[in-house]
UniProtKB/Swiss-Prot annotation:
Belongs to the zinc-containing alcohol dehydrogenase family. Glucose 1-dehydrogenase subfamily. NADP(+) binds at residues 182-185, 207-208, 272-274, 301-303. It is an enzyme of class 1 (oxidoreductase). This is Glucose 1-dehydrogenase 1. One of its GO terms (molecular function) is D-glucose binding. Keywords: Carbohydrate metabolism, Metal-binding, NAD, NADP, Nucleotide-binding, Oxidoreductase, Zinc. PANTHER family: GLUCOSE 1-DEHYDROGENASE (PTHR43189:SF2), ZINC-TYPE ALCOHOL DEHYDROGENASE-LIKE PROTEIN C1198.01-RELATED (PTHR43189). It comes from Haloterrigena turkmenica (strain ATCC 51198 / DSM 5511 / JCM 9101 / NCIMB 13204 / VKM B-1734 / 4k). The keyword Zinc applies. Catalyzes the NAD(P)(+)-dependent oxidation of D-glucose to D-gluconate via gluconolactone. Can utilize both NAD(+) and NADP(+) as electron acceptor. Is involved in the degradation of glucose through a modified Entner-Doudoroff pathway. Substrate binds at residues 40, 115, 151, 303.
């Protein structure tokens, strides 16, 4: 079978041949339909994040997948059933651990998990993959063409759930929401806040010039676009309004601290971006004081569990179809898989790029 893999330091993915995997007891064989590409894939390809499986010299990419059960292999799944795989698995040689037993692999610390297509385990960018049946979340046939969006939406499901949990000790009624980042994850999240969650006052930060497809989506949704070059995050409360909930999806390290200043009293910021090391000065005393005197909170969030995947399926079904169509910039077959990935040699900057979300198609739906 064909697969898309990367070798450490290579900087570009390649198409390779691998044998079709054999499902172990409790596993199903899945025929891959489509696999999404996101910023994590770019980081893995660049060697800035992740790692190959033990004893291997390359990593099969892909963690945002949708497929169809080819061989149920005695599990409760049915052949022909559409499924989306979760990402985390126990480390090699470990059948399970307390985090997986609790159904909370997303809360496992480093060393207690591997992530398919990211670190320590091959991903889903292959014509077939195997997976434990309990790591496969059913999805309807009508959602299968965009099922690769379930994983990123599940990331937001968890972040919102955990942010709300920090406010559960009192009667918290958020009205204003601020999404930092107008990439694919930020756009999907802004769409969730406006449509399936029903927020009226939603703002989204970016640094792109009009016209741009991402800003067009925000305008159509009724989300206020804020250009960070004109209004930096700390100035947002004065120019617009203080925010009850800030959702950070930029990976820009200063935003972790600036989010505190953007929050309204009793607000919470959820941080999802993963920045590189960066030293800079902050007024720690002022930020500490802001959090204490105004009951503010910050929560970090990574990965998601099966329940959040299931919620993401429902959310995806509730999003307007036009949003999905506009977010997905292109789906490319194996003969042109390179087009789905960012080109590190391209002179065009991210600000000029009109691509929002891409995917590789391995099999017709």
């Amino acid at each position: 079978m064909k697969a898309i893999a990367v070798e450490p330091g290579a900087g570009t993915p390649t198409l390779i041949d691998l044998p079709v995997p054999e499902p172990a007891p409790g596993e199903a064989l899945v025929r891959t339909l489509r696999v999404g590409v996101d910023g994590t894939d770019d980081e893995v390809i660049a060697g800035a994040h992740g790692g190959v499986p033990d004893g291997d010299d390359r990593l099969v990419l892909g963690h945002e997948a949708v497929g169809v059960v080819e061989d149920a292999n005695g599990t409760d799944l049915e052949e022909g059933q559409y499924v989306v795989p979760t990402v985390r698995r126990p480390p090699p040689g470990v059948e399970t651990n307390v985090y997986f037993e609790r159904g909370e692999p997303d809360m496992a610390p480093e060393g207690e998990y591997v992530e398919r297509g990211i670190v320590g385990a091959h991903g889903f960018m292959a014509e077939y993959f195997t997976s434990p049946a309990d790591c496969l979340v059913p999805i309807s046939a009508d959602l299968a063409p965009v099922g690769f969006l379930v994983e990123p939406i599940s990331i937001t499901e968890k972040a919102i759930e955990h942010a709300a949990a920090t406010r559960s000790a009192f009667d918290w009624r958020p009205e204003s929401v601020f999404v930092l980042g107008n990439g694919s994850l930020g756009l999907l999240t802004a769409a969730m806040f406006r449509t399936t969650m029903g927020y009226d006052r939603v703002y989204c930060l970016g640094r792109r010039d009009r016209p741009h497809p991402s800003i067009d989506i925000l305008d159509e949704l009724g989300v206020t676009y804020i250009d960070s070059r004109e209004t930096p995050v700390p100035e947002v409360p004065e120019v617009y309004e203080p925010m009850d909930l800030v959702y950070e999806a930029t990976g820009y390290a200063k935003h972790a601290f600036e989010s505190i200043e953007a929050l309204a009293p009793n607000g919470v910021a959820a941080l999802l971006g993963v920045p590189n090391d960066w030293s800079f000065e902050v007024d720690g005393g002022r930020l500490h004081r802001e959090m204490v005197l105004h009951n503010k909170a910050i929560v970090g969030s990574v990965n998601s569990n099966r329940d959040q995947f299931a919620s993401a399926v429902d959310t995806l079904a509730g999003l307007p179809s036009w949003v999905i169509e506009d977010v997905v910039s292109g789906v490319y077959g194996l003969e042109e898989y390179e087009r789905a990935f960012s080109d590190p040699t391209d002179d065009a900057t991210a600000d000029d790029d009109t691509t929002i979300k891409t995917a590789v198609e391995f099999s017709n739906i």
